[in-house]
Amino acid sequence: MEQKTGQRRRSDLFFCLAVFAAMLVFFTVLHPIPIMDEDDVIYTVLSRKAIPIPGAWNPSRMMPEVLSALCGNIAGLCTALKLGRFINCQVAVLGIMLALFITGYAYSLLRLLEKRFEAGRFAALSLVILFLELHFLIFRTEYSRNLYMFHTYDQCCVFYYTMPALLCCALVMQFMANPEWTPRLTGKQPLRESMLVLVLYFAVFSNLFGSAVLASYVLCRTIRDGLRAKKTGTGFQTFLKDEAVWLTVLLLWMIAAILESTGGRAGGKPQAVAAGAVGLPEGLRQAVGVLFQMFGKTALLFRLLMLAAVLAAAAVYLAEKDAGKKKALRQTLGGILAWSVPNGLFLILLCAVVSPGYAGRPEAMFTLLSAGMLLMILAFAALVRRFPRTGLLLPVLLVFVFSMTNTRFLTFADSNPLDLDGHLAMAVENEIYESIIRAAEAGETEVTVRVPLSGEETNWPHDGNVGNPIAQFFLKYGIIDHEITVRIQPSEEFNREFHIPLPDAG
């Protein structure tokens, strides 16, 4: 038994290292994500208190701003230690952090498959790989520059949307793997319990687009436990004691939602929300329309796999003679639907209030789309458990999905506001920041830095607010040795030099 446990742990470690390495290469070599716009800069150099702040621009989005600043500070330290240029270090640190989140997300599904579906090692690992492949296949409808589940508008959105969604989805899958386990803070396992508190704290105070799935799951779990307690005659005080952690998560999440309504938009630019501009009913109509448009842009193979999963679940349910296994399958898949529906409804409402266009962004709808893919994978897991020989087809399916996802062109879009190739975006930002460093080394106290001409009124994403915060940040880490004032000059010549398309004259 101990030998099997040791083998499983080594297998887990190897699998996690493989996923981490693959994602690290993807986000540092293939599709790097450098900072570019004002939001990226602000939250990279920001020093946010790790508590909710009523009235701030982002009152309850504590986790994104803490992690974004951590990424920036580590990158600044690496630059000061001469390990590389600042943008290169920032891309590397971000790649490591994002790869860690995705690895934890994949590992959570692995635990769920093995504990709830008794999946064999080979089948479980194959299904997790398929799950990750689906994140890249889902919007692969063109030969190049396709969206995918980890794509974002800019670097800032990785911290604000993708990471919170990954963390909350991972937590839900971990809790699903142990449906009868209720977390209790007894103090008997201080390290494990303190880590649970920290992770839940970060998850709740992250972003409503991500944390809603955790709140929906906890709500459904609490209702289920309440009905059981009523059926068994458990006292109300005992119920409250048993559910203390779940109820605290719900309470804190509601506080986060209320606090968020008191804040402004990121970047310090207050804007009218959609519900106030067009009315809530119209905002809802637009959000639903945008969401269905996004569904319509999914790849044909993805839809066929979804249909195959539905047929697989139906076949397993009809073929299963054991009433207990039927009930377990019904409870598992039905349970996902139970918390997916309130999560989806809340996301649509949130989009209607903030901006209906968010309903078409993969990073904002991540938890909803992830739930659909989770249902698909669990249906296939049930099929393999009921008909073991179908598992022999999993390697063929993995190779086929990969071949239908990858193209000989630049398959996926890069995450930056100018839609530049990631390597070109890095070169652009390196030139901008190295210009500041060169001027400081020459003893200048003022410098005018050329940036790409975008055609926007403020020249977004390179407006007048991106230079001075970075210069102050460089001074903090000794990358420059004195204060320097940075002025931004949009330049057509810069565009030509880096082969960036010039904006239309109109």
Model-identified regions with their sequence ranges:
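Intrinsically disordered, polar/acidic, low-complexity terminal segments
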Residues: 2-66, 75, 79-127, 388-506
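Membrane-interface helix-boundary motifs at transmembrane edges
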Residues: 4-8, 109-124, 179-189, 226-241, ...
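Alpha-helical transmembrane segments
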Residues: 10-27, 126-133, 195-198, 245-253, ...
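Transmembrane alpha-helical segments
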Residues: 101-113, 167-180, 215-224, 310-314, ...
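Membrane-interface micro-motifs in multi-pass membrane enzymes
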Residues: 123-178, 348-379
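Signature aromatic-anchored transmembrane alpha helix within multi-pass, membrane-resident enzymes
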Residues: 188-193, 250-251, 324, 328-340, ...
